[in-house]
Amino acid sequence: MNRHRPHSHRSKPASTQDQPDSVRRYRDPRFDAIAVKVFPGEHYVTSNPDEMLVTILGSCVAACIRDPLAKVGGMNHFMLPEAGGSGWDTASDSMRYGNVAMERLINDILVRGGMRQRLEIKVFGGGNVMKSTANIGHRNADFVEEYLAAESLPIAARHLRGHLPRRVHYFPITGRVMLLELARTEQEAVVRLERDYKSKIQVEPVAGSAELF
């Protein structure tokens, strides 16, 4: 008798370089779980109870979404491009990038048996770590809250804005989250990673679009 194994799915834009599986996945004995790193510009959906999703957020935001009954969930990691970049002429173009980041995550959960009305949503990040006058992090936090309100999707938990980067550990099957605010000494590496990501999305408009169903 064949048994179906829980499956997982990672999606990323073409601008994100592939990384060796050993970089993305590792056994974390502290949690007795397989840790899966979610990098900027990516989302990952799983129904594997052994997997824990991990990301580090500075100005970026992450939505952690699951259907507790279908036992499927995932995480994304994104920031909005600045309007006026070569690929983004208006603020509405910039918002479209955020819309697609959210819709792709939600749709991947729905096609795996999730139901919109059962979704449990937790959001994190949006810190003002780049010390920009544009306050990029808070703009990202505003977006994710406004998007979910417009879609009538309630937020079960949030830890947004502030001035420090965060490490998020998310267990999609149980909904458990462990969050750690990182010391300022660790901030430089986070900012460097996000600046690289920001420079890529400024010149690469998101491919395609998505609609919730």
Swiss-Prot record:
GO terms for molecular function: protein-glutamine glutaminase activity. Its EC number is 3.5.1.44. This is Probable chemoreceptor glutamine deamidase CheD. It comes from Rhodopseudomonas palustris (strain BisA53). It catalyses: L-glutaminyl-[protein] + H2O = L-glutamyl-[protein] + NH4(+). It comes from the Bacteria. Residues 1-12 have a biased composition (Basic residues). It is an enzyme of class 3 (hydrolase). Probably deamidates glutamine residues to glutamate on methyl-accepting chemotaxis receptors (MCPs), playing an important role in chemotaxis. Residues 1-25 are annotated as: Disordered. The keyword Protein biosynthesis does not apply. GO terms for biological process: chemotaxis. The keyword Iron-sulfur does not apply. Belongs to the CheD family. The lineage of its organism: Bacteria, Pseudomonadati, Pseudomonadota, Alphaproteobacteria, Hyphomicrobiales. Keywords: Chemotaxis, Hydrolase.
